[in-house]
Amino acid sequence: MAKKFWTFIGNDKYDIGLTGSTVYVYDKNGTELAAFKDLTYAYNAVISPLGDIFVVKTTDGRMAIYSFEPLKLIKKFRFSKIDGGQDENMVFSPDGKYFYSIESHTSTLKTLLAKYKTDDFSLVCQLFSDRERFRLSAIEYDENTDCYYVLGILYSPVTKMANTWFVAKLVDDELVDMRYLTEGERDFGDAVNRLKVMGYTEKAFQWSAFRYKKEYDDRYKISLDEIKALNYSLAALWKNASTTPIEKKD
């Protein structure tokens, strides 16, 4: 398979590869089954735990839902008018009934968490849309703890600059048990998580924070194989995070 994918993920029956302009679907023998060209700037995808559908999100505010059997586009829509910077990840609920997507709707510096029903991908609600100076960068469901975790940033009302970095649980669509990180811990965790959800591809690694931050931060001087071996998760990050705020002074 000679194509250079930004994202390459799979389940027990199919693999999905994203080049940015084409969504490829393969069987587990590497045979190409479909090549969808419905989107541009498409770098993120996630497969339902039920194995029946998958979602692709673009950085320019669009989303497409595809079925595996039959292989076809089910729905495509624009979820935001913000064109650019829509590269935060997304996740299905463990029962496959709901879908959570981190989205920017008013500014790339502010996010909300959109919740959709997966039977028709209608919008259920937009969580945290009323929060100012608030940005999520990652969401993950952890099977071991049966809980969602989110990674985020709070901004100072005075300077409008980031001054608090956190990882929290999402329970009943509310943030609870917030724990705190240093700026460096949050940035490193976000960099690893972005590679994880993209399937640790070489292309994603080459254009990640690991490409340029290694020049001044030794934590980033590691190989892609070493990053995979970290077995990184937001649940583990939360477990080891501080229970008291680590706030950057204005």
Show the residue positions of the predicted features.
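Sequence/structural signature of beta-propeller modules
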Residues: 2-5, 191-250
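Repeated scaffold domains used in trafficking and secretory/extracellular systems
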Residues: 2-8, 40-47, 83-91, 131-141, ...
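A short beta-strand motif characteristic of beta-propeller blades
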Residues: 31-37, 72-80, 122-128, 177-179
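Residue-level detector of Asp-centered blade-edge/turn motifs that repeat once per structural unit
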Residues: 10-11, 49-50, 94-95, 143-144
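Structural motif
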Residues: 20-22, 61-65, 108-114, 157-167
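Residue-level marker for isolated small/hydroxyl-bearing positions within beta-strands
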Residues: 18, 57, 102, 151-153
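Short loop/turn segments that connect beta-strands within beta-propeller blades
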Residues: 27-29, 68-70, 118-120, 171-173
